[in-house]
Amino acid sequence: MLSSSLLLILTACQPAERENADLVFRYNEAAGISSLDPAFARNLSNIWAVSQLFNGLVELNDQMVVQPSLAKRWEIDEDGTLYRFFLRQDVRFHHDLSFSGSMGRPIRASDFIYSFGRIADPQTASPGAWVFNEVARRADGKLQIEAPNDSVLEIRLNRPFPPFLGILTMPYCALVMPEAVRELGQDYRRQPIGTGPFRFQYWKEGVKLVLRRNPFYFEEEDGQRLPYLEAVSISFIIDKQAAFLEFLKGKLDFMSGIDPSYKDELLTPEGELNAAYTAQIRLTTQPYLNTEYLGFMLNPASLDKGAFAVTDKKIRQAINYGFDRAKMIRFLRNNMGSPGTGGIIPRGLPGADTLGRIGYGYDPKQARRLLEEAGYPEGQGLPEITLSTTAEYLDVNKFIQHELSRIGIKLKMDVNPPAALKELKARAKLPFFRASWIADYPDAENYLSLFHSANFCPDGPNYAHYASQQFDELYAAAMKEADAARRAEIYYKMDSLVMEDAPVVILYYDEVMRFTGKNIRGLGSNPINQLNLKRVYKVRD
């Protein structure tokens, strides 16, 4: 139960409008939270909670620029393989009398050796183990990371890897308290001890999660210690329509994204906030580094017997040409997002196709011509193709199904629970599947890694089992290129090659949509939809 201290107002040293602030920020997480351990921060719901509790060496700001966090500065040697971080001296773990006394012990560089080694250890079974793939290994298989003293950390890479600093901003790379993890074991998932602006208070799974203000947090703003909020309260209402009604009643402060159940109630066809809600709600939008797409499994041997794999490039290209993405965005998403007429790299990252030169527009005549060249005029003789999706995206996929039927391509919908779809996709068991990729770090390599032959699932994110020697050679060249502009040129060539081979169908580039009450202040946003609450405060209406 929340204590009465949550009703206290902020101290008088705050700006005047903050003095009357309510101190609890409330949001709903329909998808649930499975773990508060950074080792398992693989989805947005876990990431948002973990990000309030933990810090890493570095972090991203709203402009996607890497900033200091627990490291106050860093150096990279000339050959790009040695990263040296100089740690802050004023950071302590959350206080827990079982491990660290009333204030929490200071952090040490050796804590990072433990934290990173734990992610890379196969026994941890972290889905984020791949983030340290480029770190050199010792003869015993451990990461080549040194702590010359308590305030200096050195990380040695196998080869130059320009995206590495961005990778270190991911929650997988957060600092955990070694003695707490050792003592708690698997219970650390629900009893986390970090260094973040909020500390763990209470969690009844599926009902309520409460985080409390960390009174010893190291960051300040305008001479005042962050965060401004006293607590964060997270509910787990599964029904998104019910959660929306709670938001309208003022019982939630924030919603991200929009569900078809209330889309037309809240937004105009042009994607603006309906006039009935402008006095009550604030809508903020920006491009989202999230590419929504359909993927083909190009390796028939992995599929179950009888499944039809679309191994003919001409058929895949025909599907790409066979539906109107702009119409789909306009009518099914109220113009929230932009049509996927470019490559896999979303706009906003260097290397992206901003002019639609390498992707696919709506061209049914070209689609029919390609089908005829493939030996299936008007689709005659072409087997039915099974498209696996989830209920949330069924409207979009039914639109594509209808559009493709007009040129002779028959799709069969296979609706799965999200977890089941993810598992089948990772095991290469789906011939044609809905997917999306949200940037883990601000580098186009993150998207192009989906097509590197070394990343075949289940060991990596190449869910299509796409393989191209030319692509792999370009990938290797990009990783050796220190100049960002020249590296972006290589990325563009790689994206062009992928789109020509068409292992995917780009649907649209998403948009961050945030709905807040008019009393919320200080809630920023960035293109990967991070939730940063350390500067948030509330004012009375």
Regions found by a protein language model. Give the residues of each.
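Extracellular/periplasmic solute-recognition and catalytic clefts
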Residues: 201-212, 235-302
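A structural "hinge/loop" feature
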Residues: 31-50, 70-71, 97-101, 162-173, ...
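Detector for C-terminal structural segments
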Residues: 162, 204-208, 281-292, 318-353, ...
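Aromatic- and charge-enriched surface segment that lines or borders ligand/interaction sites
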Residues: 73-125, 154, 243-246, 309-312
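Surface-exposed binding/hinge segments that line
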Residues: 111, 118-177, 204
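Structural transition elements
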Residues: 198, 313, 339-374, 393-395
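N-terminal lobe/hinge region of extracytoplasmic solute-binding protein
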Residues: 28-79, 117, 124, 193
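Gly/Pro-rich hinge or "lid" segments in bacterial periplasmic/extracellular proteins
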Residues: 150-151, 159-227, 231-233, 241-242, ...
